[in-house]
Curated annotation (Swiss-Prot):
Family matches, as InterPro entries: PQQ_b-propeller_rpt, WD40/YVTN_repeat-like_dom_sf, WD40_repeat_dom_sf, WD40_rpt, Znf106, Znf_C2H2_type
Main location: nucleus
Localisation: Nucleus, Nucleolus; Nucleus speckle
Tissues where this protein is expressed: Widely expressed, with strongest expression in skeletal muscle, heart and brain (at protein level). Detected in spinal cord motor neurons.
Quaternary structure, from the entry: Interacts with KNOP1. Interacts with TARDBP and NUP107. Interacts (via N-terminus) with RBM39. Interacts with the SH3 domains of FYN and GRB2.
Role played: RNA-binding protein. Specifically binds to 5'-GGGGCC-3' sequence repeats in RNA. Essential for maintenance of peripheral motor neuron and skeletal muscle function. Required for normal expression and/or alternative splicing of a number of genes in spinal cord and skeletal muscle, including the neurite outgrowth inhibitor RTN4. Also contributes to normal mitochondrial respiratory function in motor neurons, via an unknown mechanism.
Basic and acidic residues bias: start-end ranges: 90-108, 118-138, 150-160, 296-311, 577-593, 968-986, 1450-1461
GO CC aspect terms: cytosol; membrane; nuclear speck; nucleolus
Feature: compositional bias, Polar residues: 161-175, 342-357, 507-525, 551-572, 597-613, 644-661, 904-920, 1013-1022, 1281-1296, 1338-1354, 1470-1487
Protein name: Zinc finger protein 106
Sequence segments annotated as region (Disordered): 68-187, 287-326, 338-362, 410-437, 453-525, 537-617, 635-661, 696-728, 894-920, 968-1064, 1281-1461, 1468-1487, 1509-1531
């Protein structure tokens, strides 16, 4: 059943919250409202929290952009809170409507009338509420849950929840998605309500395990605790712990079954009902959107009074989560009422404060969810299925399942349970049962509210989904968005005050709060008790009727809550409240805190909770001031009560504690320390330092919420419990992520979470709408002043975040996106991560944690929570990583990222989070310090410290954690005060110190840093799981590696460190300008060098002089770059140079270490010692030493990339840092130089092997530079090495004939105008096939060198080249061989050599030998490009155009061949290819460029260079000389699944498929002549290339995380290379194999020995989709296409980010580099051409109807393959579509062109070969069709499939000038085909 929402005013029923919200905002509804109340009434816009007088004014408002933006934002928020039920009608309105509907209600059946009439429903709800309350009272919470839930369950089920378990779940999913429908559901009738609740519970329903159990319901809310109890026998524990509270903890399930309406019915029986859970979730969400105040106040009133009314909307769910719930609502498990109460309360509070109908505003708030609703629906649907299936399984096993899913589920359970436990523990042991109930209820309420709120964000559906997920990651996703917000606000309040109050309590509360941030925050969850008291008091005036009833239960609940106020209190303040009412909340919280402090630490926790509650309430009400006062008073009141009930609650806590601790322990294996003796430890913790424990709880609570959001309550709780002390939930979240849910669970979780976290992140593509919606995601109305303020929507949203339950992730995402649009965050991923976990929804693609640097002021807790929502956000991250990227991860963890608006409050809050284990004061202190520190501290440091602390918290006593926190704080402050570079160093040192000081802290820190980083970027689960979860797409491979990349990416994306010192930025700017000048002068030097060489006169001497000059400039540049990088690092506060990538080549060990570090969180361990030695030792010994100068440059660039993370980073190319990298940077800052040095040295060694080529002079210079810069940046070494390699390349070319020559030649060719010479070389080389002897001669001479030297050095060679060039030109007539531009020269240099080699390789492979250094490597690498046709065998005498390679040459030589050059380049490419082994396959990068369904689709794997002019003739030459026979057209059979990549090498067609095999076909016979097996998963890419001599090897990359190297002759697997993630694309050049992984990294291998060289963190957590190479002067470029919609241009030697090419709106699937241009095909159905060197978007080719999977350039034409089953041929210059080739039965996954034959591989496993003939054109003259086919049969197929319907009844032939008419009766169906085919044959041919 889909939960329905009914507008009791308009009598319209909606199936989703979104629809209901849209209706509630609509003029239709407001007209009815005016009809009901009279003209000129106040129309409140819930979304904007603005009241307009009169319908016209309201109409004007809703048509405004601000409102639309707010709606978008709220929808986003509600995406996560979909479960939450909103009150769409306040009490007054409900009464009015009820009166008006009294008659109709009486007329209608009871259920309908109830749904329709508030009165009916009210009584029923009241009765039900009372029953639940009575039950609760009689059961004293645990019993209540125990018995009550079953009672309710059965009752509800009877009422219509019976089917809920099956149908209701889905229903509830949908309904939860539509809190608006809440009222409808409630109204529907008790029965309807029950259905509603079931719907709410649907999460529970999905989790039927909760069905009969309260626990499940809790789970439903998405709190782990409920799951734990549910799944297991823990149910009683939960009951004891929080019969109510627990349920509350499991906000998701709790609300529904526990609370009001449904809750009442459900209350006890329902408690277990999955549906209840869903309702709970819905309520929670509603609460979240309603905000605590509403919850609190209205819960009391609404629970009873409005339960009938509000129950209609949200009453049932709200009942439980409403603020009043804590005291009475807690006892009453009327989620619905609670929700409605919350809504009402919020409205009431608003009314009180604003003097208007708060509910109305609330309703509108709920209405925001409209957009989220849709997503919610989707999520719900998904969840329904998932939950439905899981639910039944989980219902009973839920608890067990939770435990089993430890990482995923357990954490959820844990969170739910631990919160309960904590709450009970926090509370004194006065009345265990009662307290457990009260506390638990309160907490559950909070949790539920939080969960609902968060889920509300994703949508209530999302919430339900989270419930579904809940078993795995119950709350993570739904909570993630709202959760974060709640957590942030709550974190602020809670962490500042609540954290100290009670660890366990806090945890529970926090969980609850997080779950029901919006409603709970108002004092729903956190302030359960306080809120109940507060809310009851506050609401008492408004909701006296419910209050009276609630007051009894509420009294108990309050007492209980009071007992667990610490718990509630802590969570509450920190949750939404703080965010909602930043200043006010803070003050209120402060006052409350003071009161609490006065009371006692334990009590103070309670007080804080109360205060938080009050604050939350106030926030919700929107009358911040009034509410604040009210809150304060309530807070005090609550505190008193809390004190009273705290003691009784302790036993409950204790009782819960064991169970909790068990869960926690399991989950906290990582973070067991804090919760060490989960039972006694936690209790002791609470008792010994209630403040500390409370802090812990708060932190944990935040963490758990985050975890819920992120992973699950269980994870959250675990993190919270153990590590909350250390770090804000954000940090814990990552830890949780690492807890190790099963990879599959994690993946699912991430997907769900990301979906939930991001309202619109279902798709893999970036969801801009999602980002936009984020702004208003808070779901709470903003103050009118805020609405009306002229602030930008995003800013306003951020500022109002505390007030509203903002999904900070989304907010950040939006901000980041905007900044990026402005060019601010330019880069790493110029696009928002698609779905925020887009396709993958892996939220690792969840990794939507934007760079929080922009939100530096935000409260860490809040941020943490988002981080906690990591799972949801994991996906988001990927998808919305852009958003989160903006805020540094550390900020994210520290809270600086989230609470811009709450910066002041946030400061304390983060501290609290950090020192959760510490005393309240300490926590507050830390928060205060951390908040400031966070902004300044680098992501790395903060993340590192906090994660470490978090982890330690789990592993070490709170004492340890505290020190860590302090150290982190100190570090932050230090960093703040120190200059960037200094700070960087300090950060490194501080981090290292804190880490080391914590014993295993080092590892923990690095791990945590990684995790934290990752968690923000990736999903918490992934992070925590690092290893197991790494598999999530977002952060795959190395858990930390992906994570770090995520982080890195975040940083890069955000790239805005608003708080970074401007001076640093200015400095950076100055240095950058200077560096630019120098780089220009360097280019000039290169040009001069080339000219000098070309001149050959005094060239040699001159070249030497110029080389020296160049070296000097390079060294100076390196120094500058180093300085700049340091500054950038300081800005980023993360000093993790991409040196890792740089180092990677030199030290596989380093990379591996790094990976292991990321995975095992041993980054720290890796750090200083190992790297230092390595750095120190290798540099001097290797040529790399000389290269340090250059490495410095590189380092600078690398750092620059890092540094670009800050505001200025946008301009500076920032290398996206993977979480791992970032973590490394954090860990490495101190020993960074040394570490990197080591790695660099290793790299240098590697380079030495292949870099011995470099001249000694450069080495010397480099060594000097290295010595100077070694410590400056380890990256420098690498960079220097790179630079040296370049320089060496030049000088060696002079010095050493072979390698140096090659390098020099290559360099010269690349570097300078040697383009002419290069062109000649190319021509000659490309023509070499023509003259094998000549080719051989030149080839032996080192084609690269030959090119460079012969072109530049020997006139003779040059002349010969020119001759060849001329000859070739003649031969190629159409193959234009224009001179290569400087940019191209390198490319062409390599290519000509390659070409020569191709010819030679094919013939003698002499070129291979001669091709030393880069050239040979290039040739080898070049073979990757299938498209590069080898001119070698211009077998076709008709055209020497043999060299007409496909655009492979583009890949090979992106330099500047003109279009003609492109042809030549293509030719050259083939030569290189052939040299590589006669490999005509398009570059591997192309092969791996495109991915479909995660399967790489080769882009233009074999691009035949058919000059268009010579295109008719098969001008391409296959790599091997034996390709004399012409390939035949037809099909190749054998594959059983999608063909992912295709390459032609030696007259054979190599294909790889998802059927795990690679097949080899003969091009002539088309028979399969061999099969390569061994992979265990789909093979995504392949690359055939030459190795030493004539031997050739096949590399295959697979989703089984391996690359296998086969001997192509014996077909034996020679080696298997293990990688961290799925291998999506391969590319080779310069004797290096580049592998693009799904975690966003590029790993390089030496083709000679298959040794790993480097790891470049490029686009993590988003996958690398395709690779290509190019050259820029002497610099070798690696072009990386990614799923984040951007293409990054990097230094191929060290991975340094040079620039980012943006423009695509979806995943980049394929690339082809030609001359200076990169042609990229994307899922956005377009092909873009960018200038590689400037980053400028030159042109866009449209006309595709689906994703473009392959792009090939053949001369002047571009051939593209598309998923719409067509191959299109475009003219490059005019953009005209020349031809279309069809005939495919499925989507084209890969394509290559060889000898004018197009080879395509399809998704169904079919492979076809079709002749490319531009001379034959068959036009489709069907009306409106403009396609021109190259094959008549394709036209026929097109006509029959696209223009006719096989089932037509009547058909009119719409061919030009034809009016034939066919009918099915005439039996003319057969005639149709014949008729149409005749048209095709007779009338279609057009003269060309």
């Amino acid at each position: 059943m889909v939960r329905e929402r009914k507008c009791i005013l308009c009598h319209i029923v909606y199936g989703s919250k979104k629809e209901m919200d849209e209706h509630m905002r609509s003029m239709l509804h407001h007209r009815e409202l005016e009809n009901l109340k009279g003209r000129d009434i106040s129309h409140e816009c819930r979304v904007c929290r603005v009241t307009e007088v009169g319908l016209s004014a309201y109409a004007k408002h809703i048509s405004g952009q601000l409102h639309k933006d707010n709606v978008d934002a709220q929808e986003r928020e509600d995406d996560g809170k979909e479960e939450e039920e909103e009150e769409y009608f306040d009490k007054e309105l409900v009464q009015l409507i009820q009166e008006r509907k009294e008659q109709s209600r009486q007329d209608e059946p009871p259920s309908n009338s109830q749904e329709v009439n508030s009165d009916d429903r009210q009584p029923q709800w009241r009765r039900e509420d009372r029953i639940p309350y009575q039950d609760r009272e009689s059961y004293s919470q645990p019993p209540r849950h125990h018995r009550g839930p079953p009672q309710r369950d059965w009752k509800w089920e009877k009422d219509g929840f019976n089917s809920t378990r099956k149908n209701s779940f889905p229903h509830s999913l949908r309904n939860s998605g539509g809190p608006r429908g809440s009222s409808v559901w409630h109204k529907g009738a008790t029965r309807g309500s029950s259905t509603w609740f079931l719907n709410h519970s649907n999460s529970g329903g999905g989790w039927h395990s909760n069905n009969g159990m309260v626990d499940w319901n809790y789970n439903g809310t998405g709190r782990n605790s409920s799951w734990h109890s549910e799944g297991t026998g823990g149910f009683p524990s939960w009951h004891m712990n929080n019969s109510n509270g627990n349920w509350k903890s499991s906000v998701r399930g709790t609300n529904s079954w526990n609370y009001n309406g449904l809750g009442d019915k459900f209350q006890q029986g329902r408690n277990r009902n999955p549906n209840y859970q869903m309702e709970d979730m819905t309520k929670m969400w509603n609460k979240k959107s309603n905000k605590p105040s509403k919850y609190s106040q209205e819960r009391c009133k609404w629970q009873r009074q409005d339960r009938d009314k509000a129950a209609k909307y949200r009453s049932p769910p709200e009942g439980y989560a409403s603020d009043t719930f804590p005291s009475e609502g807690l006892l009453e498990f009327n989620f619905e009422q609670r929700e409605s109460q919350t809504t009402k309360q919020t409205d009431t509070a608003a009314s009180k404060i604003n003097g208007k109908n708060g509910t109305k505003a609330r309703d509108k708030f709920r209405r925001w969810t409209p957009y989220p609703s849709q997503k919610t629906l989707d999520l719900q649907s998904a969840l329904k299925e998932v939950i439905g299936s899981k639910s039944d399984t989980l219902e009973k096993p839920l608890f067990n399942f939770s435990l089993i899913t430890a990482g995923l589920r357990k954490p959820v359970d844990k969170t739910s349970n631990p919160p309960v436990i904590k709450t009970q523990k926090a509370g004194p042991p006065g009345s265990p049962s009662h307290k457990a109930i009260s506390d638990g209820t309160a907490f559950c309420e909070v949790a539920r509210a939080c969960s609902i709120t968060e889920q509300s964000e994703p949508h209530q559906k999302s919430n339900k989904i989270p419930l579904l997920k809940s078993p795995l990651l119950p709350l993570p996703t739904p909570k993630s968005g709202p959760h974060k917000q709640n957590l942030k606000n709550r974190s602020k309040n809670k962490e500042t005050k609540s954290f100290p109050s009670g660890d366990h309590s806090h945890l529970l509360n926090t969980s609850t709060l997080e779950g029901s941030h919006g409603s709970s925050y108002t004092s729903k969850s956190l302030g359960l008790c306080p809120r109940v008291l507060k809310e009851n008091k506050t609401v008492s005036g408004t909701q006296k009727e419910p209050d009276e009833k609630l007051n009894n239960t509420s009294q108990k609940a309050q007492d209980t809550v009071l007992q667990c106020p610490k718990t509630l209190q802590n969570p509450l303040p920190t949750t939404p409240k703080r965010m909602e009412n930043d200043a006010k909340e803070s003050s209120v919280e402060e006052s409350a805190k003071d009161s609490l402090s006065i009371e006692s630490q334990p009590h103070s926790a309670g007080n804080s909770a109360m205060t938080s509650d009050a604050e939350n309430h106030g926030i919700k009400s929107e009358g911040v001031a009034s509410l604040t006062t009210e809150v304060v008073s309530c807070s005090t009141h609550t505190v008193d009560k809390e004190q009273g009930s705290q003691i009784p609650g302790t036993p409950e806590n204790l009782s819960t504690s064991p169970r909790n601790s068990t869960v926690l322990q399991k989950e906290a294996e990582v973070q067991v320390s804090a919760a060490t003796s989960p039972h006694s430890g936690l209790l002791l913790d609470l008792k010994t330092s209630l403040e500390d424990a409370q802090d812990n709880n708060l932190v944990k609570s935040d963490g758990p919420f985050e975890t819920e959001s992120f992973e699950d309550t269980s994870l959250d709780t675990e993190l919270q419990k153990p590590d909350l002390n250390n770090q804000p939930p954000g940090t814990l979240l990552p830890e949780l992520s690492k807890l190790g849910f099963p990879a599959s669970l994690q993946r699912d979780l991430s997907r769900h979470i990301s979906l939930k976290s991001k309202t619109g992140t279902h798709l893999p593509e970036p969801n801009l709408n999602s980002a936009r919606r984020i702004r208003n995601v808070s779901g709470h109305r903003k103050n009118e002043t805020e609405k009306e303020s002229g602030l930008k929507p995003t800013l306003r949203q951020i500022l109002n975040a505390s007030r509203r339950n903002v999904n900070w992730e989304q907010v950040i995402q939006q901000v980041t996106k905007k900044k990026q649009e402005l060019g601010k965050g330019l880069p790493r991923f110029g696009i928002e991560m698609v779905p925020l976990v887009q396709n993958e929804q892996e939220v690792l693609d969840l990794d939507e944690e934007p760079d929080l640097s922009s939100l530096e002021g935000f409260q860490w807790e809040g941020v943490s929570i988002p981080s906690s929502s990591g799972l949801a956000r994991k996906r988001s991250l990927s998808e919305s990583s852009v958003v989160m990227d903006r805020a540094p991860v550390y900020s994210f963890f520290t809270g600086e990222g989230t609470g811009k608006e709450n910066e002041a409050q946030q400061s304390p809050s983060p501290n609290t989070a950090l020192s959760a284990a510490q005393s309240q004061k300490t926590a507050m202190y830390l928060e205060q310090e951390v908040a400031p520190l966070t902004p300044s501290v680098g992501t790395g440091e903060r993340v590192g410290n906090i994660p470490t602390q978090r982890r330690h918290s789990a592993q070490l006593p709170s004492g340890h954690i505290m020190p860590v926190m302090h150290s982190a704080r100190d570090l932050h402050s230090q960093e703040r005060s120190t200059p960037l570079s200094e700070r960087h160093a300090q950060e490194s040192t501080g981090e290292g110190n804190s880490l080391s000081s914590n014993a295993s802290s080092g590892h923990a820190v690095s791990s945590l840093a990684d995790a934290a980083t990752d968690s923000s970027c990736t999903s918490g689960a992934e992070q925590t799981d690092g290893h197991s979860i790494r598999k999530k797409r977002r952060a795959t491979g190395d858990g930390s590696s992906p994570e770090l990349p995520s982080l890195e990416r975040k940083n890069k994306r955000r790239k805005i460190k608003g708080k970074k010192e401007r001076s640093q930025v200015d400095q950076l700017l100055t240095i950058s300008l200077r560096e630019e000048e120098l780089s220009k002068s360097l280019q000039c030097m290169d040009n001069k060098l080339l000219q000098a060489r070309a001149a050959l006169q005094t060239a040699y001497v001159e070249v030497q002089r110029l080389l020296v000059l160049k070296q000097q400039i390079t060294v100076e540049m390196s120094a500058l770059r180093t300085h700049r990088i340091q500054i950038l690092q300081g800005l980023q506060e993360t000093y993790e140079p991409p040196e890792h990538p740089d180092q990677a080549p030199c030290s596989l060990i380093s990379r591996e270490q790094r990976n292991s570090r990321s995975q095992t969180s041993f980054e720290t361990a890796l750090l200083p010692a190992p790297f230092f030695p390595g750095f120190l030792d290798p540099p001097p010994s290797h040529a790399s030493l000389p290269s340090p100068g250059n490495p410095l440059q590189i380092t600078m660039s690398t750092f620059q990339a890092h540094g670009t993370a800050p505001d200025s980073s946008v301009q500076i190319k920032q290398e996206p840092m993977s979480p791992e990298q970032e973590g490394n940077m954090n860990a490495l800052p101190q020993g960074c130089a040394s570490n990197v040095s080591k790695e660099l040295l290793q790299t240098n060694r590697v380079v030495d092997d292949g870099s011995s080529v470099y001249p000694a002079i450069p080495a010397v210079i480099a060594s000097e530079s290295t010595e100077n810069c070694q410590e400056v940046s380890k990256d420098l070494n690498f960079s220097v090495e790179q630079g040296n390699s370049r320089s060496k390349g030049n000088s060696p070319s002079c010095q050493s004939p072979d390698l140096p020559g090659i390098n020099r030649g290559e360099e010269t060719a690349k570097g300078s105008s040697g383009s002419e010479a290069c062109s000649s070389s190319f021509l000659r080389l490309s023509f070499t096939p023509e003259t094998p002897a000549e080719k051989e001669t030149q080839s032996p001479a080192d084609q690269p060198e030959q090119q460079a030297e012969s072109t530049l050095a020997s006139a003779e060679t040059r002349g010969s080249k020119k001759k060849k060039k001329l000859r070739k030109k003649k031969t190629l007539r159409a193959t234009h061989v224009p001179e290569n531009s400087d940019t191209e020269q390198d490319v062409f240099t390599a290519k000509p050599a390659r070409k020569v080699k191709t010819a030679k390789a094919a013939k003698g492979a002499k070129v291979t030998t001669s091709q030393t250094g880069q050239e040979q490597g290039t040739a080898r690498d070049e073979p990757d490009s299938d498209s590069s046709l080898e001119v070698l065998e211009v077998t076709n005498p008709q055209l020497e155009v043999v060299a007409i390679d496909t655009s492979e040459s583009g890949d090979e030589k992106p330099d500047s061949p003109s279009k003609k050059d492109a042809w030549i380049a293509a030719e050259q490419n083939p030569i290189e290819t052939s040299r590589s082994g006669c490999d005509e396959v398009s570059s591997t990068s192309e092969l791996g460029t495109r991915y479909k369904d995660g399967v790489p689709v080769s882009v233009a794997e074999t691009q035949t260079v058919i000059s268009i002019k010579a295109s008719k003739h098969s001008s391409e030459i296959s790599s091997e000389p034996g390709d004399d026979e012409e390939p035949t057209e037809g099909s190749f059979e054998g594959h059983q699944a999608a063909v992912n990549a295709i390459q032609i090498f030696g007259n054979f067609l190599y294909t790889c498929s998802a059927d795990t095999t690679v097949r080899v076909y003969n091009l002539v016979s088309r028979k399969c002549v061999g099969v390569f097996e061994g992979h265990t998963s789909k093979v995504n890419c392949l690359l055939v290339t030459h190795t030493s001599g004539k031997s050739s090897v096949l590399y295959t990359g697979s989703s089984d995380h391996t690359i296998r190297c086969y001997n192509i002759k014996t077909r034996e697997c020679m080696e298997q290379l293990q990688l961290e993630d799925r291998v999506l694309c391969l590319h080779n050049r310069w004797r290096t194999l580049y592998a693009g992984l799904a975690n966003g990294t590029v790993v390089t291998f030496d083709i000679k020995n298959n040794k790993r060289q480097e790891i470049f963190e490029c686009h993590g957590p988003r996958a690398v989709s395709c690779l290509a190479t190019a050259q820029e002067g002497a610099r070798k470029l690696l072009v990386v296409g990614s799923y984040d919609c951007t293409i990054s241009v990097r230094d191929a030697r060290n991975g340094l980010l040079l620039r980012t090419l943006e423009g695509h709106s979806k995943t980049v699937l394929c690339m082809k580099v030609v001359n200076d241009l990169v042609f990229s095909g994307s899922s956005d159905q377009s092909v873009h051409a960018h200038n590689i060197h400037t980053g400028e978007l030159v042109r866009i080719y449209k006309g595709h109807n689906h994703a473009v999977t392959v792009v090939n350039i053949l001369g002047k034409v571009m051939v593209t393959a598309c998923l719409d089953k067509f191959v299109r041929v475009y003219e490059l210059q005019s953009h005209d579509r020349l031809q279309v080739y069809g005939g495919h039965k499925d989507m084209i996954m890969c394509m290559t062109i060889h000898k004018s034959v197009i080879y395509t591989g399809c998704y169904d496993g079919s492979i076809q070969a079709v002749r490319l003939n531009l001379m034959q054109n068959y036009r489709c003259w069907w009306y409106g069709c403009t396609l021109i086919f190259g094959v008549v049969d394709h036209l026929k197929q097109h006509l029959l499939t696209d223009h006719t319907n096989p089932n037509f009844q009547t058909l009119k032939c719409r061919w030009r000038n034809c009016d034939a008419f066919f009918t099915a009766r005439k039996g003319s169906k057969q005639d149709v085909a014949g008729h149409i085919e005749r048209h095709a044959e007779d009338d279609s041919k057009i003269d060309s």
